[in-house]
Structure formats: C-alpha cells, structure tokens
A protein has these predicted regions:
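Bacterial Sec-exported substrate-binding components of ABC uptake systems
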Residues: 19-118, 229-256, 380-393
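Extracytoplasmic ligand-binding site segments that recognize negatively charged/polar headgroups
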Residues: 108, 115-121, 133-144, 184-187, ...
C-alpha cells in the first residue's frame, strides 16, 4: 500500500513539474474542464455569489446550508469546515478561497466511514450514493447497507484509520464522510486530500439537543439534493413527538448505564444527549456530575459503590447494550454485579435494555423518546409496542 501511495504522489509531483510542457497524449478532460475552456465567461467570480437563502433549522447548531443562484450551495460544519457544492451543470467559480472545499454534484461514489450517518442516507433513499463503506457487511444493522454490500454495489474500503486507498481511487470516490475519530489520525485526512478525495467530518454527535441530531437529516439531504423530503420527514418526526414534548415530567427517575469489564459503571453526564432525551420523554435523569458539560465525550466512569448510592432507588434502569453487548435476562445483569439485586427497579421489574442496533440508527432517537415515555407512563408496556427497549426479566 505504501508503495502505491509513493508511486501516486510521485506521479502527481511529476505532473505539476511538467504542466507547462505540451505532450502528445493528454489525459481525458472532465465535462467541467471542457466547459471551462469553451465558455470561460460562464464561471462566476466567488465574490459575485450571493448566498441569500438558507435551509431552515430549528434545533441543529453544528451546520448551516446557504444557497446562491446558479446552482451553488455553501455548507459549513462546526467552525473549521466549509464546502461549496456545485450543481452538475454549473461552472466552478473563480477565486474560491483555498479554505473552502469544492464538491461537484452528483455525489455518487461516497466513502462512508461515519456509520451513524448511514441511517440518514437510508431515510432519503440515497444509499445508492455510497460506493464505499467503513464497515464490513456483517457489522451493519441497517438492512439497505447490508444488502448493498452483499450485492457488490457497496464495497468495504477500510476503517477510518486504515483506508484502502487503492479501492478508494479505483471507485472514483468523490467524498469521504468521516466521524471525529479521524482527528486521531490526521495523516489519513491529508493523504485522502492529496489523492483528490474531499473529506467531510460529520459532527452530529456534538449536538446537545436530541432533536438537533435528528435534524442532521437536512445536511445529508443537501448533499444529495433532497432537502424538501428531509424537511417533510423532520416535521413528521416532530409531529409524532408533540404529545410527549408537551407532556409534564412524570417525576420518575431514570439511570442509563453499562458495567465495564473491571466492574466500574459508565454513565452519561447531565449535558449528554441521552440524558436530555430522557428528560424530554418525561423522566428525571440521575446524573453524577454538576458540570452540565455538552459535548460528544460527555460520559464518565464511576465505581459501583457510587452508582449504588445514587441509583439504588431509581424508578427505571436502562442498560446500554450498544457498548457492552445485549443482555438477555436479569440474571446476566446481576452476574455483572450482585449489588444490583438491591435496586428498586430490579425488584419491581422495571429494568430495560437498549438494543444493540440503536447506535447505527440516528433517526431512531425519536422512537427512543417514545419508548422511554411509554415505560415511564405505563409500567406494563409490552415489548412488542417498543422499538429499542426490551424488558429484562
């Protein structure tokens, strides 16, 4: 692989050094390059573009989308990413700042490493835009993604820290969508960009409001030109949640946790989106911090004694099986810590396990809210009426 990269980089340097020389055999030009040569006046100046229309957002704060006439979309993510999405029949503007990454529609050979984003593409009927996956077929819980890999229309191209550059280049990748784990291996970003693959680092995990995470559907819709569908879907989601968002708190306390291999307990901080989702659903989240920190890493690990002291009288326990594996019974939970037998929720049969496929289904957060509200308002809610929660007995 290193040999391939060195060869490719050497070729790029050789090309740049010889750009002034005319050669008998020239590489085939893209349609955009041919248009630019035939109609140089068709390309507007960057300074002339007026992004005077925006995609309405109600809860999301980590991205924005603006539009200019002529087929130009400006997308910003966080404070350090900006993209110019150019329509297929539009010319790339002149003098675009180097800090802005240019994307050309249609984006149809995406390398998706941020697995949580697949659910957005699935909802938009746009899984066919993804040619390369950062997960193997056996690791997908989203059926459309699994099916695409099984029929060969989507192929495995390596995980975030070890992409298969040869496969990526052969596929003609036009965008890599990464999660923030990529910042641990910045050399991968540099290498992808060097070989001509734009990189977008998605930040939905930095949305502190659960509804903001759901609204990221609109960001992916902008990439594939389906904003109207995304807006309608988001409004439908809000409508389905209106009954619980306006519902007063039940006053019931909820603890969301898992037990690691050393016997310590991992819990969400009070500012985490899961904690906020529980509050939106009508519960009182049991927190173990006072910071109200709101970021993607808002979890903490505490000793079982501390967890026992604060959560023994919790009305509801929800075990996070997306990290530790899905539990099948109370006995399996008690095997992790016999102390849990003293907990009020264990004695009353109000212990639930979140299913392991939840973490891949970003849009399912709305259903999760409905599930939590159901178990808070009716302790006899049957599993069949829930999507992601299953009672442990």
């Amino acid at each position: 692989m290193k040999k391939l990269l060195l060869t490719l980089l050497a070729a790029l340097l050789l090309f740049s050094g010889c750009a002034a020389q005319k050669q008998e055999s020239q590489p085939q030009q893209t349609a955009a390059e041919q248009t630019a040569e035939l109609e140089p006046s068709a390309a507007p100046q960057w300074e002339e573009l007026r992004f005077d229309t925006s995609l309405p957002l109600s809860y999301a704060t980590q991205f924005s989308v603006r539009y200019a006439e002529g087929g130009y979309t400006d997308i910003t993510i966080g404070s350090d990413q900006e993209f110019l999405l150019v329509a297929q029949d539009a010319a790339v503007p002149e003098n675009v700042p180097s800090s802005i990454t240019i994307l050309r529609q249609p984006l149809s050979h995406i390398y998706l490493v941020a697995s949580a984003a697949m659910d957005y593409f699935d909802r938009l009927d746009a899984v066919d835009r993804i040619a390369l996956s950062g997960l193997k077929a056996s690791d997908w819980y989203i059926e459309s993604a699994k099916a695409a890999m099984e029929d060969g229309s989507m192929v495995y191209a390596g995980k975030y820290s070890a992409p298969d550059y040869e496969t990526i280049l052969e596929a003609g990748c036009d965008l890599a969508i990464e999660n923030t784990m990529i910042y641990h291996t910045p050399e991968v970003i540099e290498q992808l960009q060097t070989v001509g693959v734009p990189v977008l680092v998605e930040r939905s995990s930095y949305e502190s409001d659960p509804l903001g995470r759901i609204e990221w559907l609109k960001l992916y819709a902008a990439l594939v030109g389906k904003e109207a569908q995304a807006t309608a879907d988001f409004e439908s989601c809000l409508a389905s949640l209106s009954g619980i968002l306006d519902h007063p708190s039940t006053g019931k306390t909820v603890s969301f946790f898992y037990i690691n291999n050393s016997g310590a307990v991992n819990v969400r901080k009070s500012g985490d989106y899961i904690a906020k989702a529980i509050r939106l659903a009508g519960g009182e989240y049991l927190s173990f911090d006072e910071s109200g920190e709101e970021n993607a890493l808002s979890t903490m690990t505490i000793q079982m004694e501390s967890f026992y002291s604060a959560a023994a009288d919790a009305d509801v326990l929800i075990y996070n099986s997306t990290i530790d594996g899905e539990l099948q019974s109370i006995d399996e939970l008690l095997a992790k810590s016999p102390l849990l037998a003293d907990f009020k929720a264990v004695k009353s049969g109000n212990v639930w396990c979140i299913t392991k496929n939840f973490y891949q289904q970003s849009l399912a957060l709305g259903d999760m809210l409905l599930d939590v509200h159901a178990v808070l308002t009716d302790e006899k809610t049957p599993d069949a009426e829930l999507r992601f929660l299953r009672r442990l007995s």
